[in-house]
Amino acid sequence: MVTIRLARGGAKKRPFYNIVVADSRNARDGRFIERVGFFNPVARGQEEALRLDLDRVEHWVANGAATTDRVAKLIKDARKAAA
């Protein structure tokens, strides 16, 4: 099953997540099909906290990709910010 989920990066105590489309059987930070954005939960000031390619997300969801709960919330936030 193809899922849209977070892949953790960054340093210890400084998380940074790539939002990726991946096969659910692959490891969390392992092989992925496409990177559709990023999420920086510790962004400060003018730093960009969330960037998401909504066209690609909609493409993958239309083709049967499932989203994790956290990514679904991030997509909702990105749509609200874009409107």
From Swiss-Prot:
BP-aspect Gene Ontology terms: translation
GO cellular component, one term: small ribosomal subunit
Keyword Ribosomal protein appears in the UniProt entry: yes
Gene Ontology MF term list: structural constituent of ribosome
Keywords: Ribonucleoprotein, Ribosomal protein
PROSITE patterns: RIBOSOMAL_S16
Stored Pfam families: Ribosomal_S16
Gene3D superfamilies listed in its UniProt record: 3.30.1320.10
Keyword Ribosomal protein: yes
HAMAP family with a match to the protein in the record: Ribosomal_bS16 (MF_00385)
Assigned protein family: Belongs to the bacterial ribosomal protein bS16 family.
Record-given protein name: Small ribosomal subunit protein bS16
